[in-house]
Amino acid sequence: MSYLMLDLLSLDVSEAEAEMLRHPQVGGLILFSRNFSSREQLISLVQQIRQIRPEILIAVDHEGGRVQRFREGFTLIPAMGDILPAAKGDMLLAKRWACELGFLMAIELLACDIDLSFAPVLDLNGISQVIGKRSFSAKPDEVIALAQSFIEGMAEAGMGAVGKHFPGHGSVAADSHIAQAIDEREAEAIFNQDILPFKELIAKGKLSGIMPAHVIYPKVDPNPAGFSSYWLQQILRQELGFDGVIFSDDLGMKGASFAGDYLGRAQAALDAGCDMILVCNDNPGVMSLLNGFVWPDDAPQHPTSLLKPNVAQTAIALENSARWENAKQLAEQIQLAQQAKV
């Protein structure tokens, strides 16, 4: 029955937040930098959350580069766009590195009982500054190859992958966190370029989840992708055959204001085909949904339990300290190589 993912204000769970976590429609929790002061504190916080809701899906944006919420006590994962340049264009080497970095990112989170990182970014590196080096490359074939390797590393640690931001945010200058992003390109450009990483990785069964973009593609559909049944049901579900979990991007972002207040945004996202909606950085917004929204009677067709870790695989990975240590050294090597260029 759980359709909502929310967040916390600080380093522990308040009584009011504990009450929200107990609500039957809350099935997920996303953590941010403000919820982290040290690895030990994070583990304690996760234990506190699990005592309240043992099966809740705990997620974080931990892609690497500038989008890594936990730093002290964690390895600094390089930006995905630095991998191929650091390998001097050697794709075989870059794929090997991407796999090890995916493993490292995932195992460090799983060791703290965090289920999921919303990763990898499958956007192409175009004109979008909010994407930039979060993307593996400007070329679809390179994104596909490197993302697949990164996802395979995540899977070897026991973590599923969530590709974002469908069908592609890389060719939009506006930041959908603070503005309504509009991609004026023709459908042909999107389908021949941006959508290819999603298409290929879905076909290969590599994606357990997808997060759509709060971007309008007016030459294709008048609604932002995350509120569009055309994009989510006709294209993603029917044409591409995706059978995993669709997460909305944060309904608090400016790019979501298209659909009105939180009640309107939640309804539009669920009607379009999202299985779980995210509301971040807005406790009153969460409360308005918990108290005033008419939730569906049926459970999500694609429950977030599909994204719970492979416990047996994680147990094996946690024992592989040599791989973990080697991956840390690799991450540091790539970081140093990029710093030397600056």
Swiss-Prot record:
GO BP terms, alphabetized: carbohydrate metabolic process; cell division; cell wall organization; peptidoglycan biosynthetic process; peptidoglycan turnover; regulation of cell shape
GO MF terms, alphabetically ordered: beta-N-acetylhexosaminidase activity
Site (Important for catalytic activity): 175
Gene name of the record: nagZ
Active-site residues, as the UniProt record annotates them: 177, 249
This protein's pathway: Cell wall biogenesis; peptidoglycan recycling
Sections of the chain in a coiled coil: none
Enzyme class, first EC level, given as a word: hydrolase
Name of the protein in its database record: Beta-hexosaminidase
UniProt entry tagged with the keyword Chaperone: no
Segment forming the signal sequence: none
Binding site for substrate: 61, 69, 134, 164-165
Known role: Plays a role in peptidoglycan recycling by cleaving the terminal beta-1,4-linked N-acetylglucosamine (GlcNAc) from peptide-linked peptidoglycan fragments, giving rise to free GlcNAc, anhydro-N-acetylmuramic acid and anhydro-N-acetylmuramic acid-linked peptides.
